[in-house]
A protein has these predicted regions:
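N-terminal glycine-rich, Lys/His-bearing helix-loop that initiates the first secondary-structure elements
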Residues: 1-51
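Conserved PLP-enzyme active-site core in the AAT-like
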Residues: 2-3, 9-21, 79-279, 284, ...
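Positively charged, small/polar-rich N-terminal and surface patches that mediate targeting and assembly
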Residues: 2-9, 15-16, 36, 62, ...
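Conserved N-terminal alpha-helix of the aminotransferase class I/II PLP-enzyme fold
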Residues: 39-88, 113-120
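Short, solvent-exposed beta-strand edge segments and adjacent coil->beta transition regions
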Residues: 51, 215, 305-309, 367-371
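PLP-dependent enzyme catalytic core of the Aspartate aminotransferase-like
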Residues: 119-120, 128-130, 259, 326, ...
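Short, well-ordered beta-strand elements within core beta-sheets of diverse protein domains
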Residues: 249-258, 308-315, 371-375
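Conserved small-domain helix->loop->beta segment predominantly found in fold-type I
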Residues: 268-341, 355-361
Length: 391
């Protein structure tokens, strides 16, 4: 079991624990796909700290393993695995755990590709999927003796509802039901779901962990016994994160806390500006005191921050919203988040496509809804760009 060294930023910088033969304090990028046997007759090779032999790049890689050690410490878990995308990580978890007859409870508002893969898998594997309102109360009520897994996002995408993990820990037997928490929006800076009984934590490392919009990756952190099983599934499915991508994510993680704090601080300032603007109908951000999720966010989050993503409704039609989007200059029209650049997207066109139409209406994902992911620009430039686009 890997233990956290110290506070989060120190772990982010030093948590790889790589001892280099040449004294390099930066873990090298090991591009080799194959590794020599130390004892060919016995079929033995060099072992990693996980207890797995280095034989073939689809199984293990020293650079990728260094990133996994960092993530393990950031999430205060026992082990972690890195995948070649967030969806590869999520898909592997679902394929590993869900069997014919399994029931999974999932909020109707999660990343739409997660919903889509469950829609595809359910009839083929005989899985029962129960979609519920994204609240701890609705989730707990849906869990019964046949429930195998609860999958949720701590902060939902795109309307920023915050699910009270402490409520779930009190009202669900999380030894019998596997809780999988997607911590992409909140990151370990704000929250460590394992503290509340989650057996697994997943991230799209493409977002805040990588942080620069130049690498696609995913991670899963959790109990070592589960990680050992998932390692076999990753080996079979071929989803390991490649070494150069692992290096980029590891480099991004070093500045995670610094970046996330600035993005969160800027996001709150932007949310406050938008909340007072006459062209804005409403703002969805738990950092606003009037948000219905403000109190639960303050209770759960480990810092007085509320994340770098907010959503808001333009006062007007879909055409008015499109005009606003076209006028943006500093803020880029891109369907991602967590990077250095601020990005705006219309969830009905990107990100929420696979959420059922009637659920979109109920959740408030309307044609005039804009999701705004704050980057590292000066917050005054972001506000000025929004002001001119709204004028």
């Amino acid at each position: 079991v890997i233990q956290a060294l110290a506070r989060l930023s120190t772990d982010a910088v030093h948590g790889h624990d790589h001892a280099d033969a040449y004294g390099s304090h930066i873990p090298p990028i090991y591009l080799s796909v194959i590794y020599e046997y130390t004892d060919y007759e016995q079929g033995l090779a060099v072992f990693t700290d996980r207890g797995k032999m280095l034989r073939y790049g689809r199984e293990e890689n020293p650079t990728t393993r260094a990133l996994e050690r960092v993530v393990t410490k950031l999430e205060n878990s026992e082990d972690a695995l890195a995948f070649n995308s967030g969806m590869a990580a999520i898909s592997t978890v679902l394929l590993w755990y869900l069997k014919p007859g399994s029931k999974i409870v999932i909020p109707m508002e999660v990343y739409s590709t997660t919903l889509h893969i469950l829609t595809v898998l359910a009839p083929r594997l005989g899985i029962r999927v129960e979609k519920v309102w994204p609240s701890a109360e609705a989730i707990a009520e849906a869990v019964d003796s046949e429930t195998a897994m609860v999958f949720l996002e701590v902060m939902t995408n795109p309307t920023n509802k915050v699910i009270d993990l402490s409520y779930l820990a009190k009202h669900i037997d999380l030894e019998k039901v596997t809780l999988v928490a997607d911590n992409t929006f909140t990151t370990p800076v704000l929250l460590k779901p394992i503290k509340y009984g989650a057996k697994l934590v997943v991230h799209s490392a493409t977002k805040y962990l990588g942080g620069h919009n130049d690498v696609v990756g995913g991670v899963v952190a959790g109990r070592k016994s589960i990680m050992d099983e998932l390692w076999e599934w990753r080996r079979m499915l071929g989803g390991i994160l490649q070494p150069f991508e692992a290096y980029l994510v590891m480099r991004g993680v070093k500045t995670l806390e610094v970046r996330f704090e600035k993005q969160s601080t800027s996001a709150k300032a932007v949310a406050e500006f938008l909340a007072e603007h006459p062209r804005v109908e409403d703002v969805m951000y738990p950092g606003l005191s009037k948000s219905p999720y403000h109190d639960v966010a303050k209770k759960l989050f480990e810092k007085p921050l509320f994340g770098g993503v907010l959503s808001f409704r333009i006062r007007g039609s879909y055409e008015d919203t499109l005009r606003f989007m076209k006028k943006l200059k500093v803020i880029k029209r891109c369907p991602s988040l967590g990077g250095t650049e601020s990005m705006a997207v219309l969830p009905v066109k990107a990100g929420a496509m696979f959420i059922e139409p009637e659920h979109r209406v109920k959740l408030g994902i309307t044609e005039n809804l804009v999701r705004l992911a704050i980057g590292l620009e000066d917050v005054n430039d972001i506000v000025e760009d929004l002001a001119q686009a709204l004028s």
